[in-house]
């Protein structure tokens, strides 16, 4: 299996979650070994994708520097992970990605429109060799050696609609589109009101998130999956793992994980070369991982 980029440039316009203003997103092909490079068109600022570029993880994953930043990249990056894209230029004209419908499906459709192009250089993945874990109270995220890429996520909320939920997912592009990509982000009405008083979440609506009051889901159409909340957490985790710039071959496990825990996990993984190795897909003993991108 070779490195991938997209066949042609594509673009879409959507609303930014926090400012509530239109954001133009344009994707362009890049050559082998270029990586995923974000670009703030309004600032003429390149931001290469890597854990070193992460500057905030409180409400979303944010990359940048003192010169400028791009927020809420994780939903987009989960689609990039799912399609096995290694090299691409990601251009936005503001400080956040468009939220679209709060899931990844719009980005999947955009990548379908762009098409996938295989390059002349073998694709490398991060193969986890040793268990790596981050714990915070009873919360944890961990990566374990595995010959498959799997995600197991459990959440617990003191809310009658959510309660305790879990989802186990074996990665594959088709599986992602069917089981994970449409799972939306969610928020509580009382929190949204406070955030908007702070000039945040100004673009949040029931068209781009699951809204909940103290008792029920506010969206007239209801949920897309019974455990949509847990599925969205897997979507987030995939996007946060993609901040490494590569697909990761491992078993991911979490209870009540967050963007911050995911960021600390990838940073800890990559901080010690004994934890992992870069392996071409061709070198992997298991061919199942290569078939995941079919």
Curated annotation (Swiss-Prot):
Q: What class of enzyme is it?
A: hydrolase
Q: In which pathway does it act?
A: Glycolipid biosynthesis; lipid IV(A) biosynthesis; lipid IV(A) from (3R)-3-hydroxytetradecanoyl-[acyl-carrier-protein] and UDP-N-acetyl-alpha-D-glucosamine: step 2/6
* Presence of the UniProt keyword Translocase in the record: no
Keyword vocabulary terms for this entry: Hydrolase, Lipid A biosynthesis, Lipid biosynthesis, Lipid metabolism, Metal-binding, Zinc
**InterPro entries, alphabetized:** Ribosomal_Su5_D2-typ_SF, UDP-acyl_GlcNac_deAcase, UDP-acyl_GlcNac_deAcase_C, UDP-acyl_N-AcGlcN_deAcase_N
Any one annotated GO CC term: membrane
Q: Which reaction does it catalyse?
A: a UDP-3-O-[(3R)-3-hydroxyacyl]-N-acetyl-alpha-D-glucosamine + H2O = a UDP-3-O-[(3R)-3-hydroxyacyl]-alpha-D-glucosamine + acetate
The record ties this protein, via Pfam families, to: LpxC
Q: Which family does it belong to?
A: Belongs to the LpxC family.
Question: What this chain does, per the record?
Answer: Catalyzes the hydrolysis of UDP-3-O-myristoyl-N-acetylglucosamine to form UDP-3-O-myristoylglucosamine and acetate, the committed step in lipid A biosynthesis.
**Record protein name field:** UDP-3-O-acyl-N-acetylglucosamine deacetylase
**Whose protein is this, by species?**
Sulfurovum sp. (strain NBC37-1)
């Amino acid at each position: 299996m070779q490195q991938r980029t997209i066949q042609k440039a594509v673009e879409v316009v959507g609303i930014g979650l926090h400012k509530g203003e239109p954001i133009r997103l344009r994707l362009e092909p890049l050559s082998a070994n270029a990586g995923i490079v974000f670009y703030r068109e309004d600032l003429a600022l390149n931001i290469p994708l890597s854990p070193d570029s992460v500057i905030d993880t409180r409400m979303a994953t944010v990359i940048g520097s003192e010169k400028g930043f791009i927020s809420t990249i994780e939903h987009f990056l989960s689609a990039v992970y799912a399609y096995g894209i290694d090299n691409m230029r990601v251009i936005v004209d503001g400080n956040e990605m468009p939220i679209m419908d709060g899931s990844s499906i719009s980005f999947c459709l955009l990548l379908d429109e762009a098409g996938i192009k295989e390059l002349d250089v073998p694709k490398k993945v991060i193969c986890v060799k040793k268990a790596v874990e981050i714990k915070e109270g009873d919360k944890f995220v961990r990566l374990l050696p595995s010959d498959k890429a799997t995600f197991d996520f459990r959440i617990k909320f003191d809310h009658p609609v959510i309660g305790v939920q879990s989802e186990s997912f074996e990665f594959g592009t088709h599986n992602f589109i069917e089981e994970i990509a449409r799972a939306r982000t969610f928020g509580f009405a009382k929190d949204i009101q406070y955030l908007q008083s702070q000039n945040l979440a100004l673009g949040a609506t029931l068209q781009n998130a699951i809204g909940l009051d103290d008792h029920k889901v506010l969206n007239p159409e209801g949920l897309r999956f019974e455990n949509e909340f847990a599925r969205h957490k897997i979507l987030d985790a995939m996007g946060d793992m993609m901040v490494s710039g590569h697909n990761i071959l491992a078993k991911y496990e979490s209870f009540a994980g967050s963007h911050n825990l995911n960021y600390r996990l990838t940073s800890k993984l990559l901080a010690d070369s004994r934890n992992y190795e870069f392996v071409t897909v061709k070198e992997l003993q298991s061919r199942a991982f290569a078939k995941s991108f079919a």
